C-alpha cells in the first residue's frame, strides 16, 4: 500500500520486481543506501493504530441500502453500482472537481489509478468492478491536479497512502472507503481458475472478472465461470492467499483513514 510513497521518498536508487503471487518487492541498491530510514518510517507496518473501542460508535451511524436505478448497470456492477455512480454523478453535478480511483487496463493487474475530472468523466465500463488480486492503486498519484474538492476512492490502506500526498492538492477531501477485511494475491485467482477447469497462464495474458452479473455475482477467468458464493468460500472463508499487510490492518471501514462514506455488501441484511 505504501510502495509508491516509499519509492518517492528514497533519495537513492530503488526498483520494483513482480513476484509470482502478483505482489511486488522493493529492491534497494545496497551500494547506494545511506540507511536514512525514510522507507522504514513510511511503512504502515511500523506504525501503531489504536483499534480499541473501534466499533463503539457504530450504533449511532447512519446506514443506507443503495443501488443504481438502471437495472442493467445495477446487474453488471459489483454491488449495485453505488461506487461508480458516486464518482460519475459527483463529477457531473459539480459536487467534486476531481476524483482519484481506478480505471480498467488491458494487461495485468488489469487496473491502475486514474485521476478523473469534470472534463474527464468516466463511463461505467471505464472503471473495474471489485478486483480480488493486488493492485498498486497509488502508482498514478502524480496525475492528481490541484482542485477545490477532491474525492478519493479506495480501501483503508489505499486511503492512508493517498492522505499522505494530497495535502497541497485540494482545499477539501471526500473519502469513500471500500470496505475490506482482506485482499488476495494472484495465487487465489489461480486456485479459482483450477476449480473452473482452467489455469492462469505464466505470461498473465488472461482476463479475470470477480463480480457482476447479478449479486453476489459470477467469477470468470476467460471463458470459464464460477458463482461468487462458491468462489469466496475457501479464499475468503479460510483467509488463504491473503496479502500480508492485511494481517496488521484492523481498519476495515476506513475510520482511521478519515472515511466519510464506507461501501460494503449487505451480506446479512435478510437476517436483521
Named regions from a protein language model:
Residues 2, 35, 155-156:
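Alpha-helical architecture
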Residues 2, 18-19, 143, 168:
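Generic structural signal for beta-strand residues in well-ordered domains
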Residues 8, 14-73:
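N-terminal juxtadomain amphipathic helix
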Residues 48-272:
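Iron-sulfur-associated redox domains of electron-transfer enzymes in respiratory
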Residues 4, 33, 246-249:
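Short cysteine-rich clusters marking metal-coordination/redox-active sites
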Residues 1-7, 11:
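Single conserved hydrophobic/aromatic residue that forms the stacking wall/gate
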Residues 4, 26, 36, 239-242:
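Residue-level signal for mature regions of secreted extracellular proteins and peptides
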